[in-house]
Amino acid sequence: MTKKEIIILCGPTASGKSYLGHEFAKAYNGEIVNIDSMQVYKEISIITASPPKSYTAEVTYHLYNFLSITEDFSVVKYLKLATEKIKEITARGKLPILIGGTGLYINSLVFGYNNIPDISEDLREQVRNLHTEIGNIGLWNKLEELDTLAASKINQNDTQRLIRAYEVFLQTGKSIFSFQTLPKEQILSDFNFKIIFLNPERKFLYKTCDERLDKIFKEGAIDEIALIKKQFIPQDYSNLKAVGVKEILAYLDGNLTLDEALSAAQIRTRHYAKRQVTWFKKQIEDKTTLEYSNQEEFAQILNVIPAWH
């Protein structure tokens, strides 16, 4: 039986994924599925550059801005939802097009994942409260007492991985890294993945990063984060790690001017984009890479869309 096709359009932030994916979906009767870990949250749709209404009016989009930032989400939960959407799309005779830059989600969909048991909500809250009380160093010390392997591999400043490792050990009695030795579960083995990697020339990428942040700041991101601040959500909350959030919070707290906040967010975005490019180059081997160094070359990519499908 011929395998059904899935298009994955990936690459660094501000590389043009959303635009190209939207045009591809219009041309080939596609529906778009989010594969970005931050664009699932409805309260931060502006700062994460989620698809505008002009896009969603033309093409069906899935798994964007449907969760509250106060809700826990994981790669396993994402995979379950994404798999359901992909199968629904193909059942309608349409083409699933996945757009995003979260490497863990992409890697798990394509190559399988290590099935770590779900963490109970009570335990999550317990660990979160403990972290608020003792901070990263205190939690890392507790992790080291229980799981020296995880402690040796996780930086004390990596809040999300630190909390995750501690939760997993308390829930299972095993190191989170012990699950990585188990065979990976394949969830979409009856599909054929076509991976398109957008790789802009670095100077051009940094320019688009800066321009997008400037646009986002001017088009409502300040008010968006101010509203979250009023909800008294902890500023180190893992679901608020989208680039620009902490810089705007610093501005709202009076610790940075608006120009300083924008500049800091732009610098962090460029660093993030660089890490994404490195990851995709190293981790995804079977892919089509599209390179461009200016807006004119980017526009020409539309001419090669027929070769994708």
UniProtKB/Swiss-Prot annotation:
One of its GO terms (biological process) is tRNA modification. Pfam families: IPPT. It catalyses: adenosine(37) in tRNA + dimethylallyl diphosphate = N(6)-dimethylallyladenosine(37) in tRNA + diphosphate. The keyword Magnesium applies. Keywords: ATP-binding, Magnesium, Nucleotide-binding, Transferase, tRNA processing. Substrate binds at T13, A14, S15, G16, K17, S18. InterPro entries: Dimethylallyltransferase, IPT, P-loop_NTPase. ATP binds at G11, P12, T13, A14, S15, G16, K17, S18. Its cofactor is Mg(2+). The record marks T102, R124 as: Interaction with substrate tRNA. Residues 36-39, 160-164 are annotated as: Interaction with substrate tRNA. SUPFAM superfamilies: P-loop containing nucleoside triphosphate hydrolases. GO terms for molecular function: ATP binding; tRNA dimethylallyltransferase activity. Its EC number is 2.5.1.75. NCBIfam families: miaA. Monomer. Belongs to the IPP transferase family. Catalyzes the transfer of a dimethylallyl group onto the adenine at position 37 in tRNAs that read codons beginning with uridine, leading to the formation of N6-(dimethylallyl)adenosine (i(6)A). This is tRNA dimethylallyltransferase. The lineage of its organism: Bacteria, Pseudomonadati, Pseudomonadota, Alphaproteobacteria, Rickettsiales. The gene is miaA.
